[in-house]
A protein has these predicted regions:
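A generic short alpha-helical patch detector that favors 3-5-residue windows
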Residues: 24-25, 152
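Short glycine-rich, Thr/Ser-proximal phosphate-binding strand/loop in the N-terminal lobe
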Residues: 25-40, 116-122
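Short linear Ser/Thr-Pro motifs
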Residues: 10-12, 31, 98
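N-terminal beta1-alpha1 ligand-phosphate binding loop
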Residues: 3-24
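Anionic-ligand binding patches
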Residues: 3-7, 41-186
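Short loop/helix-cap segments at secondary-structure boundaries that form the rim of catalytic
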Residues: 17-21, 38, 60-61
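Short, glycine/serine-rich, charged loops/turns that create anion-binding
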Residues: 13, 33, 176
């Protein structure tokens, strides 16, 4: 695969690992995009706007490069759950996910400075009930604090997974197959 300079506009170690399944020939430039004022009617539309904003913020400073921007949110009944800000926030999130089905939306945007394309991939996730003891033990680790919804599906949260409908890698923050197909068009 020959591609112009590919830049991942994310500091996520999981996205770096997943993009490496496609190519190891990329650099990382974390976007300085300000997410605070971004709104949208639905969580899926929000995550696409966030991915696009991150992508374009990096693309403007790297003409000629192909930039990949991503964002992931957890959606519980239409309410966006981002990354927890505290132990209590993480516990609140995990209680909301316990024994319930939620959606994970990952927005992906690619731009070469001339053309910009994006998509959202969604996955339904159902957890078994999570005991207070499990929540306490999990929130005592570092695992939940840099992840949307306060969990890492590839980590200890795998123990709570009842079922999922969709792409497992969407939950991790980069739907690899669809992203590869999009990158192949650039």
């Amino acid at each position: 695969m020959m591609m112009k300079n590919l830049i991942l506009a994310s500091g996520s170690p999981r996205r770096k690992e997943l993009l490496s399944l496609y190519t190891t020939d990329f650099t990382i430039c974390v976007s300085d995009f300000d997410e605070s004022g971004v709104t949208a009617p639905t969580p899926a539309q929000l995550v696409e706007k966030l991915a696009r904003g991150k992508c374009l913020a990096v693309a403007k400073d790297h003409p000629g490069a192909v930039v990949l921007g991503c964002d992931t949110v957890v959606d519980v009944g239409g309410e966006v759950i981002g990354k927890p800000h505290s132990v209590e926030d993480a516990k609140r999130m995990l209680r909301a996910l316990s024994g319930a089905t939620h959606e994970v939306h990952t927005g992906v945007c690619v731009s070469d400075g001339v053309r910009t394309e994006s998509f959202v991939d969604s996955c339904k996730v159902t957890f078994f009930p999570i005991s207070e003891g499990e929540i306490d033990a999990y929130t005592a680790t570092k695992e939940p604090y840099d992840k949307a919804g306060a969990y890492a599906i590839q980590g200890r949260a795998a123990l709570w997974l009842d079922r999922l409908e969709g792409d497992y890698y969407t939950i991790m923050g980069l739907p690899v197959s669809r992203t590869a197909r999009l990158l192949n068009r650039f």
